[in-house]
Amino acid sequence: LRGEVRGLPSSFRVVTSRIVNDGIGISAIVINDPEADVLVIEDCTDEYGVCVLIKGATCSMYVVSVYCRFGTALGPYLQYMENVRVKCGNTYMIMGMDANAVSPLWFSKGENLGRGRLNEANGLLLEEWILEGRMIVINEPSEWYTFSGPNGSSDIDVTLVNEAGGRFGYEWSVQPEWGVSDHNLIRIRVSLDGLVADASPSPQSARWQTRDTDWGEYMGDVKAKADVFGLAQYENVSVDEKVDLLTEWIYGANDWNMRRHTAVRTFQNEWWSVELAEKRSELRRRRHAFQRIRNAGAASLADRLQAFRDCKIEYKRMLCEAKLRCWQEFVASESNENPWGRVFKLCRGRRKPVDVCSVKVDGVYTDTWEGSVNAMMNVFFPASIDDASEIDRLKAIARPLPPDLEMDEVSDSVRRCKVRKSPGPDGIVGEMVRAVWGAIPEYMFCLYKQCLLESYFPQKWKIASLVILLKLLDRIRSDPGSYRPICLLDNLGKVLEGIMVKRLDQKLMDVEVSPYQFAFTYGKSTEDAWRCVQRHVECSEMKYVIGLNIDFQGAFDNLGWLSMLLKLDEAQSNEFGLWMSYFGGRKVYYVGKTGIVRKDVTRGCPQGSKSGPAMWKLVMNELLLALVAAGFFIVAFADDGTIVIGANSRSALEELGTRCLQLCHEWGKRVCVPVSAGKTTCILMKGHLSANRPPCIRLNGTSISYKSEVKHLGIFVAERMNFRPHFVYLRGKILGLVGCLRRVMRKSWGLGRRATCILYKGLFVACMSYGASVWFRTLRFSYASILLNRCQRLVLYASLNVCRTVSTERMQVLHGELPWDLEATRRGLLSEFRKGITPVDGDPITDEEMLGLSGSQFKELLMERLLDVWQGRWDVSEKGRLTHEFIPSVRFVRENEWMAFGLCLGYVLTGHGSMNGFLHKRGLSNTPVCMCGAPNEDVKHLLGECPLYEDLRDLNGCGLLIRNGSLDVSGALSEIGAFEKLNQFAVSLFGRRSRLMRGMRIRE
């Protein structure tokens, strides 16, 4: 469906062909063996077929799937298959194809031969290719056709192997009983005689399930094991032996108190039932009954065909209903208990594994799993180009011993260990480290103290497990730059790293540090970096201001160790020897199901380590200070830098920009981090220049690109600091999130109100409000508020049980959450209050009112003022007047959590729904007349007047009154009892109305 294979377990790996012009994927390969490594052959996967290399314990083999479309020429498919055959070479390859061609070579039945059809002509072409390419057909004669549909039967499916596969034995058979598709399933058994399984399978890290662990008992077990060995004896062993002993004690306690984590999890197929099994058997019987007499021309042929089709339709209906019912029960039990759990991850697609693809290196694709991983690792971890003699010189300098380690230092570092995160190679998670520190702090303190005294970082903690993530789904998968490496390090080693980084931060307090690095600094964020740029642009007296967004190529991966050591030496770090040990002998490995690829690391900051950010901040500080000294203004967040340059002429801008980039280039050359001329961009932030002649700023003779719109630190901005592109981007992002969660945010079932509210605030509002303090002032323009509230409408419609035609104003009140323009304003003003920024004219709270307010008082007052603004809008709005009668106060739903309604009550509260009066206005009904004869069927008529529902009506119980001949609904939601009765009345009313309408249509 739309190029995807759906309905399979999440543990299955699916590779599909490229989407063709009509949006249909035509072939796929599904791998259900979790113990196999899969390499997608990118240069042999296109619109004609799919090719993967599967590596198991005994051998590697190419698996190819080809679908030749009916009625099309075979030439392009033969060219594709020839390319695959050449690519596979002498490696075993098996190809399954729907050839839409017949031939005696693959035992097609005789009645389909000699008729001059296109499939026979294609069969002749395929025969020639098979013979020329020395391919082997492993089809065997069968009484069953490979294709058997209502319109005919034929043997059009071919299975081929190359010469390398000819040495194995095959059992090829058609299995008509295994499925109900027109294409019968084909089973192929391969006898791999003579092949021996790998005796040294890939090592797997130990993992334990920490859920429901009794940590008190766990700590007692760790302490008991440590006490058996004794602290005195522990103090006398080497550092590496201490690490091994501590790990052994933790493993013992883990095995006693927890279950080992298994990579393969099996889930019972709960939706399959006896009724489905019986219906499937009936469908097979009817299919065979039809096939037996089809060629005989029996008189009952049409009856049997119709019976087969009816049974097939019924079977599919039962399948869909069973799957949907099971999914609904799963959503109800899982998501309402934990909205961020398995259901959320399934909807977001987070559980789908990403297979390694063949990558292009110097114009040539890799053809093995190990080759692809090695090529990626060579990009992620480039070889060092540092001067070894200079490193030896630094190592030879005599240095004083570091200060004695304090218990508080270790305790603070342990406390900063993150929980519920993936562990390193040793499998020890943050929860375990905290528990071990609570059980045997003296042993851990002894270990880290000796590391500092000996200036030795244990070798075991310098080995990282590599995880390769695809940056974006639309990236070119054959490009190593499309992937992000994450190094998983041992948490015990991260504790020592934390101690080292903390001491380095204290040492840097005596060194000049640029205030314009906003990353890795307490109290600073991306929003602070953006506001700093905004203030500089607004305060600039120059006629023109441009922003240079500097891109450092592989910043963390390429940073030279020598540059870091030199900066540590300049800072006179007392732990220099420990840092030297930390950088030496580092290794990384990538584990597959059947193998492991290792590499020595001689450069860069491990992405995932605690020291990486500190090292980058230390080294980049030199560039920031140099640019400021040269008269430039720069704001940096990690490796993202924006240089703001002002001038009164184009030529001056170009001269300053070129000189600035030259400074960055020279610094990057020294620290082995080149500036990427292709990704560095320029944008005009102030002033007007000709669109046909943007500023020409060069880096080593290459002009950097000028952009009219850029994305920086997650925020889109256009020329002259216009944030309109960001609101357009937000709509697309919110729409994507809503689309993912529509599987569980349904009108008649799905997430409950509690889960919906959690996702609304924790996902949608958080996504919308990112960077709000930067762009919320733009909301004074009507276009910005309109665009932002349109984004909110997408979420509200998915969250509420109302019709699509309900206005945004009504949905905001029914949901009880601030309009997004007010929510963004609230978050922006709160951020400014925390930073001590003075309010401007038009803000809800004046400067005088802010005096003496605490943070909580300001937050409460701000919310009240914004609610008043919202109330004013609701009172004067021309839309939603019926809803205003039910809910005149915007605070009502916020103050009453029980206000959760279904679709029928949504009809009542909004006036939009299954009512002739409403439908007639929109051209969806021929008449506004009610079935009782009243001229206009609307909500008030149904609730208070229509005689068809008199026996269901309880006006007093529902809080409804008849005043002056009209229905007063203001008391309908006055208390939970009236609300529940009104809800029941609405369900009964519209249920009966639906039945009456069906009866009228039948009579007509």
Curated annotation (Swiss-Prot):
Q: Does the keyword Hydrolase apply?
A: yes
Annotated GO MF terms: endonuclease activity; RNA-directed DNA polymerase activity
Annotated region (Nucleic acid-binding endonuclease), positions in chain: 853-1004
Question: Which Gene3D superfamilies does the protein's record reference?
Answer: Endonuclease/exonuclease/phosphatase
Every copy of the Reverse transcriptase domain together lies at 450-717
Recorded catalytic reaction(s): these are: DNA(n) + a 2'-deoxyribonucleoside 5'-triphosphate = DNA(n+1) + diphosphate
User: In its UniProt entry, what is this protein called?
Assistant: Retrovirus-related Pol polyprotein from type-1 retrotransposable element R1
